[in-house]
């Protein structure tokens, strides 16, 4: 079995992360994986942001809790387990219009690249509500 297939089969959702930030080299590789994702008619309708600022991540977590209303048991545990699972790098994808397929391809490129570097990932679709007004 080739290395690409091994990496794809090895990838799984991870929800616990080490506090150390990824290296600049790893960050650049993830950016390249995102940018090299194919899109329909090469329309490139997706954008990606890499958030590594701890204060911004805390603010995003608070905003998300307020947005969804977290008085249900599933959400109250976020007091100790933020929506981003304490990952030191949080990647946000934006897809224009109905470009969900293109966004999914970009997301998978990032996840497979991360797995190949020994980095865990967790795809969280619901945080898109934070940016519903179009502001990135």
Label the model's feature ranges:
Residues 1-136:
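Acidic, surface-exposed loops and disordered segments
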């Amino acid at each position: 079995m080739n290395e690409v297939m091994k990496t794809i089969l090895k990838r799984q959702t991870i929800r616990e992360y080490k506090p150390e930030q990824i290296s600049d080299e790893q960050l650049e590789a993830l950016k390249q994986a995102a940018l090299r994702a194919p899109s329909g008619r090469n329309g490139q309708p997706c954008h990606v942001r890499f958030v590594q600022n701890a204060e911004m991540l805390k603010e995003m977590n608070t905003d998300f809790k307020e947005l969804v209303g977290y008085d249900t048991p599933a959400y109250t545990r976020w007091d100790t387990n933020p929506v981003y699972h304490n990952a030191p790098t949080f990647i946000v994808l934006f897809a224009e219009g109905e470009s969900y397929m293109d966004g999914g391809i970009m997301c998978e490129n990032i996840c497979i690249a991360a797995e190949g570097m020994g980095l865990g990932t967790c795809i969280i679709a619901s945080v898109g509500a934070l940016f519903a007004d179009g502001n990135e």
